[in-house]
C-alpha cells in the first residue's frame, strides 16, 4: 500500500466519572515506525471499505480555521492536535454516553492525495498466548469497530473549496450518533447525499429501460449490467462515473444514458460514490419488519413470486428445500 505518514499525534480521553473526562496529551508526535505505518494502513483500509456520509466545513468551523493555520505553517501539527482534542473533550462532555478513548490525528498521503484522519478508538483488553504457551493479558486498538471517524481530503479542500464532499465521516451506531457531537466538533454539515444519488440512479435506470420499451428479460439484463459496473467501481474504491456507465449501456437506446438523465432532470452528479445497500436493489428485493425478513432475486418476481398491490399480498410458488423441510416438520407435529 502506497501510504506515507507526514505527521501523526495521539492523545487520550479518560472517563473518571459520569461528569468528567480527563485529558491526557502527548508532548511529542509519534514516530512513523513500521508498526505505526501498519496501524494507519489498517485504519485507511477499514475506513475506505465502509459506507460514508459526505460533508463540508461550516464557515465558523474552529477546526477548519485551526487546520488552515496549521497548513499555512503558523501552528505546528502537535499544537493543532492538542487544542483540537481539548475541543473534542468539551463536546463529548455534553453527552452522558461519552466514554472517552484514544484520539488520533494523522496527516498522510495515499496515491498523491493528502488526508487528515481524525478518530476516537477504543483501547480494549484481551488475552494472548506467549512463546511459552502461557496466557497473558494484552491491550489492542479496536480499529475494525471504530465508528467515530472523519477524514478530510486536504487536496480537494484546498484545490476545490466549493466542494460538498471533501469531508467524509461515519454516521455511528444508534445511541452514539456522530451528528450529536462529532459534527459539532468538526464544525461541519452534511454535503453530497450519496444514498440519494444512488437512489436517483436506480430510478433513472428503470425509466431509461421503460422508455426504450425493453421486455422483462432485457430490463433485468440492463439492471445487471449497471450493478456489475457499479460493484466493480465500489470494489476498486472508485466512484460511479456517469459517462463511463453510459458507454456500458450503449446500444440499449438511440439516446445515451447520460443524455437521458440530463434531459429528464435527474440531477445526478458526473461522478458520485457507490452505496452498496442501495445498489443491491438492482438485482434483489429485500425487506424486513414485524418478525418477517424477505430477500429474493429480482428475476423471480412475476415467475415464482407474485405481488398483488391491491391486497398487499406476496405469493411464493416453490419454497426453498430447507424452508420446506422446516415447515413440513412443524405442521406435522415435529414427526
From Swiss-Prot:
UniProt main location, coarse: cytoplasm
GO cellular component: bacterial nucleoid; cytoplasm
Record keywords, A-Z: Cytoplasm
A GO term for molecular function: double-stranded DNA binding
Location relative to the cell: Cytoplasm, Nucleoid
Pfam families: NA37
InterPro entries: Nucleoid_associated_NdpA (IPR007358)
Family under the similarity heading: Belongs to the YejK family.
Name of the protein this chain belongs to: Nucleoid-associated protein YejK
Source species: Salmonella paratyphi C (strain RKS4594)
Species lineage: Bacteria, Pseudomonadati, Pseudomonadota, Gammaproteobacteria, Enterobacterales
